[in-house]
Amino acid sequence: MLVTLEGLDGSGKTTVWESLRASHDDGVTFTAEPTDSQYGQAVRRSESAADADPIAELFLFTADHADHLSRVVSPALDRGDVVISDRYSDSRYAYQGATLADTVPRAMEYVRGIHQPWTRPPDVTLYFDVDPDTGAARSGATNKFETAAFLADVRANYEQLIDYTPERFVRIDATQSPEAVIADAEAALADALPDDAWA
């Protein structure tokens, strides 16, 4: 089963991912995007460049995702592992959809169309919901993807994705304390996963 953690920068999802990884290691593969591969490193360089071309950046993200799927996610699923990924395809749709909003019409649909041949849909997505101002303040707005105005557009895209497949998403209030958010995530996974897969 493929579980993804999604949310705005500053939502605390990586803190949750780290907590889950520290307490669940038997039969669970923990991974993240961007990856540590050469493709993921190229993504990180692009993220920090204010003048990066948004179309080129989309294809960097897509290449990293395709490599991640073939090298990590699919083999782990084939072994019968639960895979928990800190960011996955929905991040691409929400973030690159916002980045390209002034470049191509129906930007999020454009991104999904490019990305979907190279992905495998998640089974469960925990969405850590936080308002854009809080997300920007927590993250420190260290790059172009972390300003409150940009995150507002990203959040609107996430809401649209939730409307598309509401049965896949579990919304978690990320304005709570880290301990409460982690507890909610643990409870959501206990509900979503078979007993023998999550103990």
From Swiss-Prot:
Entry's EC annotation: 2.7.4.9
Any Pfam family matching the protein: Thymidylate_kin
Keyword Kinase carried by entry: yes
Taxonomy, superkingdom: Archaea
Binding site for ATP: 7-14
NCBIfam families: DTMP_kinase
Protein name: Probable thymidylate kinase
